[in-house]
């Protein structure tokens, strides 16, 4: 009988990432786990719709036995079965993040018995989660270098709090893993500013682009008007293409927050990234830990290890026979498999 892993959901950043990573790793390794204190560090602890959808999606994909899978639950037991490829569809039923549900189940499908397609409906532009364009333009090219081939398509936008978006990913089983080396980002090649609008006046986008252009020499400026029924919503993004990596930063517009303030938040975030020689931004770092651990080798540099990153590493080390090393030098932290 396989050993049961016991996790404390209050450890580290105390959010949903502990649960999502545990589900992914449990499906991959076949190790069951229990988790208590789910999202104990959040104002509204326990399973929200997005987390419950991730649990049910994971259970369906690997025929798991689950206890505690209900809204508000702070305890879960998950006994995985065999991962099977297929065509899967999951609905969150709110503006909860589609990409975070995908992030939970796709790693298991890298080891499935055949290709798969996963479609999730819910929120696509959520201030607390990476948008589909981040997955498509930043994460997936890096996964391809590791030997992981998946392709994400945004079928319909769904802004917070209304939702109604749809994201789909096609994924193939991995045949072999490669080592990812991201020590330096290299020189900047292009800066792209982009604004999405749905049911919001165009002058909002023009003011956001102007705020970005006042701080950066943009090589591209794009405004995309979406159908009104996909809104109301607004997201402003800035993509930094360097020689060795493309990073993408975004801010979701909010009611009663001016276009200038929204764009200024993005400017601050991008400047913080560019002020360090590190290759990887804070949010991308979280998402490289699992694929790098599965490959058994690799490294990247990040300006500062976030609590999210450290928590994710701790969970990965509970399930896999790997150890991460973090070394600070020359203004960056080098994260590697020891």
Curated annotation (Swiss-Prot):
The reaction(s) this protein catalyses: a 3'-end 3'-phospho-ribonucleotide-RNA + ATP = a 3'-end 2',3'-cyclophospho-ribonucleotide-RNA + AMP + diphosphate
Protein's cellular compartments: Cytoplasm
Q: What biological-process terms (Gene Ontology) are attached?
A: RNA processing
Q: What is the stated purpose of this protein? A: Catalyzes the conversion of 3'-phosphate to a 2',3'-cyclic phosphodiester at the end of RNA. The mechanism of action of the enzyme occurs in 3 steps: (A) adenylation of the enzyme by ATP; (B) transfer of adenylate to an RNA-N3'P to produce RNA-N3'PP5'A; (C) and attack of the adjacent 2'-hydroxyl on the 3'-phosphorus in the diester linkage to produce the cyclic end product. The biological role of this enzyme is unknown but it is likely to function in some aspects of cellular RNA processing.
Chief location: cytoplasm
- Name the residues that bind ATP: 103, 283-287
List the Gene Ontology MF annotations in alphabetical order. Answer: ATP binding; RNA-3'-phosphate cyclase activity
Superkingdom is Bacteria
* UniProt family annotation: Belongs to the RNA 3'-terminal cyclase family. Type 1 subfamily.
Single GO cellular component term: cytoplasm
In this protein, the active site sits at 308
Query: Which E.C. number(s) belong to this protein?
Result: 6.5.1.4
Record Pfam families: RTC, RTC_insert
InterPro entries, per this entry? RNA3'-term_phos_cycl_insert, RNA3'_phos_cyclase_dom, RNA3'_phos_cyclase_dom_sf, RNA3'_term_phos_cyc, RNA3'_term_phos_cyc_type_1, RNA3'_term_phos_cycl-like_CS, RNA3'P_cycl/enolpyr_Trfase_a/b, RPTC_insert
The identity of this protein, by name, is RNA 3'-terminal phosphate cyclase
Alphabetic keyword roster: ATP-binding, Cytoplasm, Ligase, Nucleotide-binding
NCBIfam families per record? PRK04204.1-2, PRK04204.1-3, RNA_3prim_cycl
